[in-house]
Amino acid sequence: MIIHSIFLLMVSITLVIAEESDNVLFDKRAPTGHQEMQGKQNSASLNSENFGIFKRALMGFQGVRGKKNSIINDVKNELFPEDINKRAPMGFQGMRGKKASFDDEYYKRAPMGFQGMRGKKSLEEILDEIKKKTTRFQDSRSKDVYLIDYPEDYGKRVLSMDGYQNILDKKDELLGEWEKRAPMGFYGTRGKKIILDALEELDKRGVMDFQIGLQRKKDTTFDDYLDYAINPFDYEKRSTDFQDVESGSESFKRARMGFHGMRGKRDAAGIYGSNSSTVGTIFGYQDMRNRGNNFPVYQVEKRSPFRYLGARGKKNPRWEFRGKFVGVRGKKSSLQTVF
């Protein structure tokens, strides 16, 4: 009987010790997750009275983010309006945050493009630019001159063209279409396309067309000539340097200068007529043997040394005497070794 009672006492003591050991293990270990980062969740925090205040994040870094204090939020909501102090859900509060209500009106921007900086061009400015561009030419001093600056002489002639009349007649219609554009992009620079269609013909016209109208037709007969006197004896000769080409000699395999074997020389009498005369003007030079030679110089009618025939006279024929080409492309001058 005594042994049986002792055995029951030992079993009961063992059960009590086992229950206490289970409670110790439950207090030392967290149910899930890393113990160092989140630790054990206190069972007291699951109480319904403290649930809203002491509830911690189940995962992540508790010390970094954690739970916001509801008391502080309540105080903020009471002291400050919600629409002003409401923060962005993510990002940096100081950089992004909520803008004040008056910022939208104070810092109001244009919808698109640099509307405030560049603005819209008026139709009159565009027409003036096109007129200046298409009525520009250069005078004898390479200075730009615009026809619209001289309306009494040239303005009527240029502005009577079909292109300008078409624009001036439709000015009111184009201006109405110009004002209907939506405020987007660089609309001040580009403008409405209907205006570009109307001005396309004027934009494609060359500047030289107005030079022909002002200064008459350009004389292109003697464009490649030089203002030098010529020797008539050289024009009576023809090129005979290619007579031995078929013989295969080394000296006749290539033309010496220009097309002198194919075209030869021009006849001076055929160019200037039979009325031209040789006068007593003497042009002297010395050859390789230092023998003086004098040749009469073929004189031509004096003309204005400008290019335009009608307005400024006809240009002198440029026959070269000192260079390698005596004529246009003719025979090589025998006098080139002296000069």
UniProtKB/Swiss-Prot annotation:
- Which positions bear Tyrosine amide? Y154
Residues recorded with modification Arginine amide = R65, R96, R118, R190, R263, R312, R329
Coiled-coil residue spans: none
Q: Name one GO cellular component term.
A: extracellular region
Query: In which tissues does this protein get expressed?
Result: Strong expression was detected in the queen and forager heads, while weak and almost no significant expression was detected in the nurse and drone heads, respectively.
- Propeptide position ranges: 19-27, 41-54, 219-252, 267-301, 333-339
Q: Which terms does the UniProt entry file under GO BP?
A: chemical synaptic transmission; neuropeptide signaling pathway
Q: What does this protein do?
A: Tachykinins are active peptides which excite neurons, evoke behavioral responses, are potent vasodilators and secretagogues, and contract (directly or indirectly) many smooth muscles. Associated with sex-specific or age/division of labor-selective behavior and/or physiology of honeybees.
Record-given protein name: Tachykinins
User: Whose protein is this, by species?
Assistant: Apis mellifera (Honeybee)
